[in-house]
């Protein structure tokens, strides 16, 4: 029977000093012997997805105390990718994931906590905390801040629902006036919460549900809705129940590595492919799998992508569907239900809230249950009032979206596409693979062939696009933006948004060893591995080389023969210390922190985790 980890600092005569310090935090005699449960919050006023989290840790703490535990809250950092986008701030986004993982590990292990509740929400915070949870392998529950409401605007005589990507596209188009752009900007992000489409933050929060590490509705119920309060309170109660099962009954099925098994990772990736989630999820799931010592690789993702259909399309893949609509259709439990009916997931996996995923679906899938509380929960609707307050409204839809033929979530028979929403491409340009979000690609360009336009920074590519130097049929190739080459593997939301604003979104492609925001769409191929700075073939592409992309056949090739490629590689190697570096002089300050990240990071094909 495992002992409480916290006993090492709360019991024994030699720990009198430690107990004295615990008492100074508010602990009483009766508290020594209770489980100490860490609450990792990520409140910050910099990020709309986290601005409302300040007091929510105490909601969890109250329930932990009532259930017989001792709650201790701490905070970690959170970077807003949207605010960091388009300048050197984006270099820090992906590296912050490792710092978040480390900070959670440091706090939990330094203070010998017995269990963990992770309050996350946005892009790198959920993955960082997930990595930490799998390292620590103590009872853990995730509860996120929830998605933002979609913006609503009457714009150019149209009633639209919008998000931040719409504001970016509007601003880049010369056809919109300053007043029109300002109007769109003010409407795009009306409330607290993670951005309203199926971007990285919401994708990852949905995937914690699929992994079994968070409660039903975690990925979809709005940040503003009072129903989300129930998730925080239940997380506090449930974590104590998990603690008792592990420490008092020796039940290892409640541990993160038991819950997030290989089968659970396959389930999560299946959900991601079926809903056309962010390509960043590939990076983060690979990283988390390595932390949990789970044998889950790009090869597995490739196999899944060939058999999983697209059952759900959300902005930016389609303009009029946001997370509030996914929730009305049953959320991730509804999507898992359809995948289960199609025989595409394994429901024997464990969860933090039910013994198995099958048991969870029996209760929470709106197509399988008539439970009034469940049906009411999934009718939670937006309030339509700008706010930064959590749980500030209680609006409900009159009906659920149960239409699996034409609704937001489809069954396999009525899938948007029988081919998955994400694909792994291989070829002489990406020997270790690259990723494309096929759910956001127009059917007319699933195969594409064109000349490469070479750029060695995101900035130079953006300048070329905005100055009309990119023409129909060309492939914008941005290199030396990978984990090591950037360093930090910047997101390329601005180049993709500007291509769309210039009317090139369906007639051009973008290929990079960097990555894309969950808000990106179009023929955007990222994570090219090996990256340029690692000696990848992408560094050897020359201006005008023809690149052939074939998504149905999962291939990406540059039409250059092997003899020529060997000559180019030899020429590059002859540069000595100057090899595998951008020729273009980049105006980029690389700090010691970023240099340290670059020195230790691995390829995107391995999740860009550190090689230690």
UniProtKB/Swiss-Prot annotation:
Pathway: Amino-acid biosynthesis; L-isoleucine biosynthesis; L-isoleucine from 2-oxobutanoate: step 3/4; Amino-acid biosynthesis; L-valine biosynthesis; L-valine from pyruvate: step 3/4. It is an enzyme of class 4 (lyase). Keywords: 2Fe-2S, Amino-acid biosynthesis, Branched-chain amino acid biosynthesis, Iron, Iron-sulfur, Lyase, Magnesium, Metal-binding. The modification N6-carboxylysine is found at residue 124. Pfam families: ILV_EDD_C, ILVD_EDD_N. One of its GO terms (molecular function) is dihydroxy-acid dehydratase activity. Its EC number is 4.2.1.9. [2Fe-2S] cluster binds at residues 122, 195. GO terms for cellular component: cytosol. GO terms for biological process: isoleucine biosynthetic process; L-valine biosynthetic process. Mg(2+) binds at residues 81, 123-124, 491. Binds 1 [2Fe-2S] cluster per subunit. This cluster acts as a Lewis acid cofactor. It catalyses: (2R)-2,3-dihydroxy-3-methylbutanoate = 3-methyl-2-oxobutanoate + H2O; (2R,3R)-2,3-dihydroxy-3-methylpentanoate = (S)-3-methyl-2-oxopentanoate + H2O. Its cofactor is [2Fe-2S] cluster; Mg(2+). The active site is at residue 517. Belongs to the IlvD/Edd family. Homodimer. Functions in the biosynthesis of branched-chain amino acids. Catalyzes the dehydration of (2R,3R)-2,3-dihydroxy-3-methylpentanoate (2,3-dihydroxy-3-methylvalerate) into 2-oxo-3-methylpentanoate (2-oxo-3-methylvalerate) and of (2R)-2,3-dihydroxy-3-methylbutanoate (2,3-dihydroxyisovalerate) into 2-oxo-3-methylbutanoate (2-oxoisovalerate), the penultimate precursor to L-isoleucine and L-valine, respectively. This is Dihydroxy-acid dehydratase.
């Amino acid at each position: 029977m495992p002992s409480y980890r916290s006993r090492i600092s709360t019991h024994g005569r030699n720990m009198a000093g430690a107990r004295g310090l615990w008492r100074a935090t508010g602990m009483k005699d009766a508290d020594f012997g209770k489980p100490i449960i860490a609450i990792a919050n990520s409140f910050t006023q910099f990020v709309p997805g986290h601005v409302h989290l300040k007091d929510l840790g105490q909601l969890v703490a109250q329930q932990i105390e009532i259930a017989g535990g001792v709650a201790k809250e701490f905070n970690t950092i959170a970077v807003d990718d949207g605010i960091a986008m388009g300048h050197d701030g984006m270099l820090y986004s992906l590296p912050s994931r490792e710092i978040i993982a480390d900070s959670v590990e440091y706090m939990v292990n330094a203070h010998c906590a017995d269990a963990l509740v992770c309050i996350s929400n946005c892009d790198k915070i959920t993955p960082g905390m997930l990595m930490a949870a799998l390292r620590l392998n103590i009872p853990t529950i995730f509860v996120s801040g929830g998605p933002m409401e979609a913006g609503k605007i009457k714009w150019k005589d149209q009633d639209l629902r919008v998000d931040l990507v719409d504001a970016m596209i509007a601003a880049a188009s010369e056809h919109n006036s300053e007043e029109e752009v300002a109007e769109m900007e003010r409407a795009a992000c009306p409330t607290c919460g993670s951005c309203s489409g199926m971007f990285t933050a919401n994708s990852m929060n949905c995937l914690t549900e699929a992994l079994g590490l968070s409660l039903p509705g975690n990925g979809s119920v709005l940040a503003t809705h009072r129903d989300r309060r129930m998730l925080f309170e239940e997380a506090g109660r449930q974590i104590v129940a998990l603690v008792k099962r592990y420490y008092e009954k020796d039940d290892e099925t409640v541990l993160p590595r038991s819950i997030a098994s290989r089968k659970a990772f396959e389930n999560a990736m299946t959900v991601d492919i079926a809903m056309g989630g962010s390509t960043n999820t590939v990076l983060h799931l690979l990283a988390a799998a390595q932390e949990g010592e789970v044998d889950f690789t790009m090869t597995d993702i490739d196999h899944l992508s060939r058999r999983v259909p697209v059952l759900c399309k959300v902005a930016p893949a389609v303009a009029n569907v946001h997370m509030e609509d996914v929730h009305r259709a049953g959320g991730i439990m509804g999507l898992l239900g359809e995948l289960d009916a199609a025989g595409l997931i394994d429901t024997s996996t464990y969860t933090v809230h039910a013994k198995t995923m099958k048991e969870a679906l029996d209760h929470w899938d709106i197509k399988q249950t008539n439970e009034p509380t469940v049906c009411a929960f999934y009718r939670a609707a937006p309030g339509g009032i700008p706010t930064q307050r959590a749980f500030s409204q209680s609006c409900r839809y009159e009906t659920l979206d149960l239409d699996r033929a034409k609704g937001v979530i489809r069954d396999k028979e009525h899938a948007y596409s029988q081919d998955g929403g994400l694909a792994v491409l291989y070829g002489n340009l990406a020997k270790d693979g690259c990723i494309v979000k096929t759910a956001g690609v127009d059917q007319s360009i699933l195969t594409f062939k064109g000349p490469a336009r070479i750029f060695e920074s995101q900035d130079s590519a953006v300048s070329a696009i905005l100055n009309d130097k990119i023409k129909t049929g060309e492939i914008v190739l941005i290199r030396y933006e990978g984990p090591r080459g950037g360093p930090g593997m910047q997101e390329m939301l601005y180049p993709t948004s500007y291509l769309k604003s210039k009317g090139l979104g369906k007639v051009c492609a973008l290929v990079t060893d960097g990555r894309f925001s969950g808000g990106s769409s179009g023929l955007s191929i990222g994570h090219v591995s090996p990256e340029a700075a690692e000696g990848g073939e992408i560094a050897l592409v020359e201006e005008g080389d023809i690149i052939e992309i074939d998504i149905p056949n999962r291939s990406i090739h540059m039409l250059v023969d092997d003899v020529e490629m060997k000559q180019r590689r030899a020429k590059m190697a002859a540069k000595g210390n100057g090899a595998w570096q951008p020729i273009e002089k980049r105006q980029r300050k690389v700090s010691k922190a970023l240099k340290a990240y670059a020195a230790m990071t691995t390829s995107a094909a391995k999740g860009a985790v550190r090689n230690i």
